[in-house]
Design a protein with these regions (language model features):
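Receiver (REC) domain active-site loop signature in two-component systems and cognate sites
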Residues: 55
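Short amphipathic alpha-helix used as the core "switch/output" element in two-component signaling
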Residues: 39, 61-74
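Alpha4 helix (beta4-alpha4-beta5 surface) of REC/receiver domains from two-component response regulators
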Residues: 62, 85-102, 109-113, 126
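Charged docking surfaces used in two-component/phosphorelay signaling
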Residues: 15-23
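Active-site beta3 strand of CheY-like receiver
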Residues: 44-50
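CheY-like receiver
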Residues: 121-171
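Helix N-cap/capping motif at the beta->alpha junctions
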Residues: 30-39, 60
Length: 171
């Protein structure tokens, strides 16, 4: 059972996501602010973080930055969860640090698909890395492979979000 940290400053929204995750067979844990999220990560590292963007005083982007600059937490995948459409500037600035971007409101199917996609990609890359290490491939090449594999997939997903949000394909 995967543990997922839900971070949102609205207790009602946290409750909704906790219920959805429990019904999906996940083990949710919660935080109600960016600071609380960082504290929870120190004691109970999850398999994945669902992080709201529009929180105060520390918003989700700042919280994401702190997660990704801490060596102890940088490897934890983060899905941004927000009612705010992704802007091209945000995709460019934060795309390398997030695993996916989920717009609220969302359905349980969309949530589960995003979570499973991230976890499956993570397992696939981890297996590839293990095989590469066993084959004696240079660790620098392995690190670059990991970075590029994740980046290509995330950029495809962000591109799809931007195309949908801004009707780019219909223009």
């Amino acid at each position: 059972m995967y543990t997922i940290l839900v971070v949102d400053d609205s207790p009602m929204i946290v409750d909704v996501f906790v219920t959805m995750l429990e019904r999906g067979g996940y083990r949710p844990i919660t935080a109600f602010s960016g600071e609380e999220c960082l504290e929870v990560l120190k004691t109970t590292p999850p398999d994945l973080v669902l992080l709201d963007i529009m929180m105060e005083p520390m918003d989700g982007w700042e919280t994401l930055g702190k997660i990704k600059t801490d060596p102890a937490t940088r490897g934890i995948p983060v899905l941004m969860l927000t009612a705010k459409p992704l802007t091209p500037e945000e995709a460019n600035e934060y795309g390398a640090f997030i695993e996916d971007y989920i717009l609220k409101p969302t359905t349980h199917h969309q949530l589960y698909e995003a979570i499973e996609h991230v976890l499956a990609r993570r397992h696939s890359i981890t297996a590839d890395i293990e095989r590469a290490r066993e084959a004696g491939i240079d660790p620098r090449i392995i690190d670059e492979y990991e970075r590029l594999s994740k980046g290509v997939d995330i950029n495809r997903r962000l591109l799809k979000i931007l195309e949908t949000t801004y009707s780019i394909k219909d223009a």
